[in-house]
Curated annotation (Swiss-Prot):
One GO CC annotation: mitochondrion
Membrane topology: Multi-pass membrane protein
Catalytic activity: (S)-malate(in) + phosphate(out) = (S)-malate(out) + phosphate(in); malonate(out) + (S)-malate(in) = malonate(in) + (S)-malate(out); (S)-malate(in) + succinate(out) = (S)-malate(out) + succinate(in); (S)-malate(in) + sulfate(out) = (S)-malate(out) + sulfate(in)
Tissue expression summary: Expressed most strongly in liver, then kidney, and at lower levels in heart and brain.
Highest classification ranks of the organism: Eukaryota, Metazoa, Chordata, Craniata, Vertebrata
GO molecular function, one term: secondary active transmembrane transporter activity
TM helices/strands, residue ranges: 9-29, 62-81, 102-122, 162-181, 202-222, 254-274
Solcar repeat spans: 7-87, 100-187, 196-279
The protein's name: Mitochondrial dicarboxylate carrier
Subcellular location per the Swiss-Prot or TrEMBL entry: Mitochondrion inner membrane
Species this chain originates from: Rattus norvegicus (Rat)
PROSITE patterns in alphabetical order: SOLCAR
């Protein structure tokens, strides 16, 4: 009998951490662009300003929080999605229909988004800290220090500021990434022209990254503004209204860097994940 392998529940978190290490500078630039009150700088200009002002390593500000986020948010959503998908297809003759993948992706993303909200809050703050005046900087030493100080100084409730938005975005991103990746890979393999190899993984994940970017950009902007606020927004709706006053384009601030960051991040995540599954996955006789 042929031997196949399935993912272990924590592979998604490990793969996402590997991808985050590669794409963190792009994530940082995306946050800087989204938190501008007016559109003053584009992606290249923002990158040059960060390097000139704080040095090249400033592009990696908040990396510990980003990794902490991946080990909460991404680990949770991948674990739920892949475990449930494998369970639901265990005795079936074919893959899940697309609507089932979308439903699974939505549930997994909602849960992962909520679990990852505290780390996401600290991640956004650490990335944006250098833009603040010296007197207003939070100067978190690392992710755990940030989590501890937010809980101590602002209360445990503040750790989940923007949880609704983060969960909603998590659902959209997970549908765009995991559900669309599975579907794209299934369609590519069904043509018979490509086998289950690295190029297939690259093509499928590239499609998934594009889907995820377009699905979640407006919510991503609102989430970033909510998490970086000092209480000026009363909620998601109020934040949306205030953002709308800046014009429709305000909802798509940082669209290019979001795509430039999310598409490579998605590609790297799934290529790492497929290699982890291939070499270290659970053996299944088929």
């Amino acid at each position: 009998m042929a031997e196949a392998r399935t993912s272990r529940w924590y592979f998604g978190g490990l793969a996402s951490c590997g991808a985050a290490c590669c794409t963190h500078p792009l994530d940082l630039l995306k946050v800087h662009l989204q938190t501008q009150q007016e559109v003053k700088l584009r992606m290249t200009g923002m990158a040059l300003q960060v390097v000139r002002t704080d040095g090249f390593l400033a592009l990696y500000n908040g990396l510990s929080a980003s990794l902490c986020r991946q080990m909460t948010y991404s680990l949770t959503r991948f674990a739920i999605y892949e475990t449930m998908r494998d369970y639901m297809t265990k005795d079936s003759q074919g893959p899940l229909p697309f609507y089932s993948k979308v439903l699974l992706g939505g549930i997994s993303g909602l849960t992962g988004g909520f679990v990852g909200t505290p780390a996401d809050l600290v991640n956004v703050r650490m990335q944006n800290d250098m833009k603040l005046p010296l007197s207003q900087r939070r100067n978190y030493s690392h992710a755990l220090d940030g989590l501890y100080r937010v809980a101590r100084e602002e209360g445990l409730k503040k750790l989940f500021s923007g949880a609704t938005m983060a969960s909603s975005r998590g659902a959209l991103v997970t549908v765009g990434q995991l559900s669309c990746y599975d579907q794209a890979k299934q369609l590519v393999l069904s043509t018979g022209y490509l086998s289950d190899n690295i190029f297939t993984h690259f093509l499928s994940s590239f499609i998934a990254g594009g889907c995820a970017t377009f699905l979640c950009q407006p919510l991503d902007v609102l989430k970033t503004r909510l998490m970086n606020s000092k209480g000026e927004y009363q909620g998601v709706f109020h934040c949306a209204v205030e953002t709308a006053k800046l014009g429709p384009q305000a909802f798509f601030k940082g669209l290019v860097p979001a795509g430039v960051r999310l598409v490579p991040h998605t590609v790297l995540t799934f290529m790492f994940l497929e290699q982890l599954r291939k070499h270290f996955g659970i053996k299944v006789a088929t």
